[in-house]
Swiss-Prot record:
It is found in: Cytoplasm. Belongs to the MnmG family. The keyword Phosphoprotein does not apply. NAD-binding protein involved in the addition of a carboxymethylaminomethyl (cmnm) group at the wobble position (U34) of certain tRNAs, forming tRNA-cmnm(5)s(2)U34. PANTHER family: GLUCOSE INHIBITED DIVISION PROTEIN A (PTHR11806), PROTEIN MTO1 HOMOLOG, MITOCHONDRIAL (PTHR11806:SF0). GO terms for biological process: tRNA methylation; tRNA wobble uridine modification. NAD(+) binds at residues 269-283. Transmembrane segments: none annotated. It comes from the Bacteria. It comes from Beijerinckia indica subsp. indica (strain ATCC 9039 / DSM 1715 / NCIMB 8712). Its cofactor is FAD. This is tRNA uridine 5-carboxymethylaminomethyl modification enzyme MnmG. The gene is mnmG. FAD binds at G11, G12, G13, H14, A15, G16.
Length: 618
């Protein structure tokens, strides 16, 4: 026997690292099996972490003492909060990362985890004791264990496409996981093929930057991790350019070489991250598509052109790239490609990401039909915790839709399945006013402490912050003004005779804690970090009761019958994607509509309201 562990994690990507670290934090003796230690923490596609919906997941991973947030802070070279002009519930923290720094930081984190061994080799099969998992085959030897987490990414029988050329690989230059794909197939699991793509990597020294629009980060970078005090890396700019009609002409002329349009690829790609070929075909009337030129590091010339992933032949890639402003003389360091890979229907899984028919086998990341580092990391954390719980004879660890975005994601996956790579959006969450990025620690760290997956440093910081928040809330609750007093201080309130606490007043438009400090100087004792949280809590307090009432009404309507002749095309507020699916499937009830892939809680609420109005006027 090569070794005996409680948990063996297969794969050293974003899901695997979180799974291995989470398992070990819960006290399980854990092994991480990867083809090469040097590839742990690699960013296979874009050099960025976070974004809309995704940034929420990173904060939740961090709140449960995961790695991604801290590593992104250590490697971040441009930080921006997306949707800053909108409400706090839909703001998304995002960071460009230096690939080398990210990989190095993740490897350092993995090496520092107590109870975690890294084993280089290829996992080729699974061992069983009856129907239960008993180990993993690594080469000709066995790692005995009580639970296994598979985080195979795009390696599961991966096939790279560049034009008409095909190469069996899990990532460019790395071997695929052929044997494990066959092993899963032998279990009789429902499986399919998906695909994703990546653009060419460009030499920044050959780009005419003077012609491009500059995109800077936030003046004051906002970290992902609740443990990070400040961002210390030098910050860089990104740049924006666009495709041109000439670009589109070159692509159209060569579509027959694209593996998607030639029929060489059968797997579905991510709807919200289409290739440039798909964009040109699907949006034929568009004369330009935006491209973000993102530096891949502080000391390398490599540029990632976000927005033009492609699998066209190398010569065609060179032609269309040089029709783009600023890229007329661009040199290509690595050509773009598409990759097709196996996935397991996530409806095979429990809420703890355990395969229902194979006790002790857990899956996380792209093997479950998702796309994105953040989605993978969040699943890895949950799978790792549950694998450790399984090995220790503990109850499953789950999070529901009202607790976390990671709960929303897993619930979507295991109940709806996927037909295309799943990506997290804020619109998928019914409770997004509660599930904000800013309060992830307040929602999850306490539960993590009870579970035993939170380290001492985070526990102490969380306790101190919670005490400060409670103290600030108590202080605000103890101060109040009558309408007359409020008016005297320049605050606009209803003349209803009701006294309002300082917390109530914070919910008023244009009222901040700084405004109230001019009335009550004692509020100056509230630290700025706590003040920001309190202001957001106060802003949303009045809406949360309304949201809870809306959700209760929505649940009552789940059994509502939908007319067979309902005109979805004329319904305002629905995306074209949802209109198309409703029209094609024609669900009989609101409940059935809710199970359609891609359906959102907001769309269901609109649908229910439309049917109720129609019934009222019948």
């Amino acid at each position: 026997m090569k070794g005996t562990y409680d948990v063996v994690v297969v794969g050293g990507g974003h899901a695997g690292c979180e799974a291995a670290a989470a398992s070990a934090r819960l006290g399980a003796r854990t092994a991480l099996v990867t083809q090469a230690f040097a590839t742990i923490g690699s960013m296979s596609c874009n050099p960025a972490i976070g974004g809309l919906g995704k940034g929420h997941l990173v904060r939740e991973i961090d709140a449960l003492d995961g790695l991604m947030g801290r590593v992104a802070d250590a490697a971040g070279i441009q930080f921006r909060v997306l949707n800053r002009a909108k409400g706090p519930a839909v703001r998304g923290p995002r960071a460009q990362a230096d690939r080398k720094l990210y990989r190095a930081a993740m490897q350092a984190e993995i090496q520092a985890v107590n109870g975690l061994d890294v084993i280089e080799g290829e996992a080729e099969g699974l061992c069983f004791d009856g129907e239960k998992i008993a180990g993993v085959l690594v080469g000709v030897e066995t790692l005995a264990c009580a639970a296994v987490v598979l985080t195979t990414g795009t390696f599961l029988r991966g096939l790279i496409h560049i034009g008409e050329k095909q190469v069996r690989a899990g990532r460019i230059g790395e071997a695929p996981a052929e044997a494990m794909g066959l092993a899963l197939e032998a279990l009789g699991l429902s499986m399919g093929r998906l695909k994703t793509g990546t653009p060419a990597r460009l030499d920044g020294r050959s780009i005419d930057w003077s012609r491009l629009e500059r995109q800077s980060g936030d003046v004051e970078p906002e970290p992902f991790s609740f443990l990070t005090e400040a961002i210390t890396r030098p910050q860089v700019d990104c740049f924006i350019t666009t495709t041109t009609p000439e670009t589109h002409a070159v692509i159209r002329e060569n579509l027959h070489y694209s593996p998607v349009y030639s029929g060489a690829i059968n797997g579905r790609g991510p709807r919200y991250c289409p290739s440039i070929e798909d964009k040109v075909v699907r949006f034929a009337d568009r004369e330009a598509h935006q491209i973000f030129l993102e530096p891949e590091g502080l000391d390398v010339p490599t540029i990632y052109p976000n927005g033009i992933s492609t699998a066209l032949p190398e010569s065609v890639q060179e032609r269309f790239l040089r029709t783009i402003p600023g890229l007329e003389h661009v040199a290509i360091l690595q050509h773009g490609y598409a990759i097709e890979y196996d996935y397991v229907d996530p409806r095979e899984l429990t809420a703890g990401l355990e395969v229902k028919r194979v006790p002790g086998l857990f899956l996380a990341g792209q093997i479950n039909g998702t796309t994105g580092y953040e989605e993978a990391g969040a699943q890895g954390l949950i799978a790792g915790l549950n694998a450790a719980a399984r090995a220790g004879g503990l109850a499953p660890i789950t999070f529901d839709r009202s607790e976390a975005y990671l709960g929303v994601m897993i619930d979507d996956l295991i109940n709806r399945g996927v037909s295309e790579p799943y990506r997290m959006f804020t619109s998928r969450a019914e409770y997004r006013l509660t599930l904000r990025a800013d309060n992830a620690d307040q929602r999850l760290t306490g539960k993590g402490m009870i579970l035993g997956c939170i380290g001492q440093q985070r526990a102490e910081i969380f306790k101190a912050k919670s005490e400060a928040l409670n103290s600030a809330r108590d202080l605000l609750a103890g101060l109040s003004l009558s309408p007359t007093e409020a008016t005297r201080h320049g605050l606009k309130v209803n003349r209803d005779g009701v006294r309002r606490t300082a917390f109530d007043l914070l919910a008023l438009p244009d009222v901040t804690l700084e405004t109230l400090r001019s009335i009550w100087p004692e509020l100056k004792t509230i630290p700025e970090t706590i003040a920001a949280q309190i202001e957001i809590d106060a802003h949303y307090a009045v809406y949360l009761d309304r949201q809870e009432a809306d959700i209760a009404a929505f649940r009552r309507d789940e059994g509502l019958a939908l007319p067979t002749d309902l005109d979805y095309a004329s319904m305002q507020g629905l995306s074209n994607e949802i209109r198309g699916r409703l029209a094609a499937i024609r669900p009989a009830t609101l409940g059935q509509a809710g199970r359609i892939e891609g359906m959102t809680p907001t769309a269901l609420t609109l649908l229910a309201a439309r049917v109720r109005r129609a019934g009222a006027h019948a």
